[in-house]
From Swiss-Prot:
Topology of this chain in the membrane: Lipid-anchor
Nucleotide-binding keyword on record: yes
Spans annotated as G2 motif: 173-181
GO MF annotations, alphabetized: G protein-coupled receptor binding; G-protein beta/gamma-subunit complex binding; GDP binding; GTP binding; GTPase activity; metal ion binding
Keyword Kinase: no
Matches recorded under SUPFAM superfamilies: P-loop containing nucleoside triphosphate hydrolases (SSF52540), Transducin (alpha subunit), insertion domain (SSF47895)
Biological processes per GO annotation: adenylate cyclase-inhibiting G protein-coupled receptor signaling pathway; cell division; G protein-coupled dopamine receptor signaling pathway; GTP metabolic process; positive regulation of macroautophagy
Protein name according to UniProt: Guanine nucleotide-binding protein G(i) subunit alpha-3
Chain spans, region G4 motif: 265-272
The encoding gene: GNAI3
Length: 354
């Protein structure tokens, strides 16, 4: 009897080849879809990373889209100067010039009646005089003692530009805007032949219960930490240090059974603010046991170790750490390029293609 295959055998071989081919195609397709979850405590820079993805991978914000952010820029600017003025009362700081007390009263009147998206020359003048006051600057230098947006000085220092009648926010202005994320914001983009689905989830405690809905099929988690938060307390709990809250949260995510096989990427963000702050505010505020110097390199490395040491599966799970400045497009582009290479490698491994 010869070794020739019967028609049925040939059909079976073809079917087997087709199944193998389909499995491989499915594997390759799965390897090209990336579900990224952006997690972290409130105000750690997650939404800014999402905005950067639009700038880097989706041709940025159109002029029309930038115009829509004018309302937010003005709101952030006004709320920042109001927060400083209110803090002066709590911290018992006097105005450098007594006449500024009248400006402060005028600020509250004008801010209360301001039309959305408009900044009158009268309101801009009041804010400008207040911001230049010595007492206001003294209070601003103590901003760790109250809640103040990171973008406060950025907008207030640029008041002449942003208060022009023909003002259109720049991409950088848009990046600096602060709007609390509620719910889940989904962004899609393509990069390095991969189709990314990025989910930005509100970081305040009240928003975290919504995270569970995003967990299924996650390729990688980008966990954002604001390095500059080491000497601040939470807006929602003034007894809790923000860095301690971030560590607690990272511990629960990093060691969660849901994420045993999920790549964890740690963004130690706001490195620019941290580099300035560490010169005047010691790391021992957050870590009393710290004995190193208050230099950027040593203090940042210590914080990195504090987070990486929370990983209880070091033998099987690697944490990929990057120092970032979410408002710096070039920095984010460079870091995200490296992150994508890690995702590609790990994704192909899981699909048996690496």
């Amino acid at each position: 009897m010869g070794c020739t295959l019967s028609a049925e055998d040939k059909a079976a071989v073809e079917r087997s080849k087709m199944i193998d081919r389909n499995l491989r195609e499915d594997g390759e397709k799965a390897a090209k879809e990336v579900k990224l979850l952006l997690l972290g405590a409130g105000e750690s820079g997650k939404s800014t990373i999402v905005k950067q993805m639009k700038i880097i991978h989706e041709d940025g914000y159109s002029e029309e889209e930038c115009k829509q952010y004018k309302v937010v820029v003005y709101s952030n600017t006004i709320q920042s100067i109001i927060a400083i003025i209110r803090a002066m009362g709590r911290l018992k700081i006097d105005f450098g010039e007594p006449a500024r007390a009248d400006d402060a009263r005028q600020l509250f009147v004008l801010a209360g009646s301001a039309e959305e998206g408009l900044m009158t020359s009268e309101l801009a003048g009041v804010i400008r005089r207040l911001w230049r006051d010595g007492g206001v600057q003294a209070c601003f230098s103590r901003s760790r003692e109250y809640q103040l947006n990171d973008s406060a000085s950025y907008y207030l220092n640029d008041l002449d530009r942003i208060s022009q009648t023909n003002y259109i926010p720049t991409q950088q202005d848009v990046l600096r805007t602060r709007v609390k994320t509620t719910g889940i914001v989904e962004t899609h983009f393509t990069f390095k032949d991969l189709y990314f689905k990025m989910f930005d989830v509100g970081g305040q405690r009240s928003e975290r219960k919504k995270w569970i809905h995003c967990f299924e099929g996650v390729t990688a988690i980008i966990f954002c930490v604001a390095l500059s938060d080491y000497d601040l307390v939470l807006a929602e709990d003034e007894e809790m240090n923000r860095m301690h809250e971030s560590m607690k949260l990272f511990d629960s995510i990093c060691n969660n059974k849901w994420f045993t096989d999920t790549s964890i990427i740690l963004f130690l963000n706001k490195k620019d603010l941290f580099e300035e702050k560490i010169k005047r505010s010691p790391l021992t505020i957050c870590y009393p046991e710290y004995t190193g110097s208050n230099t950027y390199e040593e203090a940042a490395a210590y914080i990195q170790c504090q987070f990486e040491d929370l990983n209880r599966r070091k033998d099987t799970k690697e944490i990929y750490t990057h120092f970032t400045c979410a408002t710096d497009t070039k920095n984010v582009q460079f870091v995200f390029d490296a992150v994508t290479d890690v995702i590609i490698k790990n994704n192909l491994k899981e699909c048996g293609l690496y």
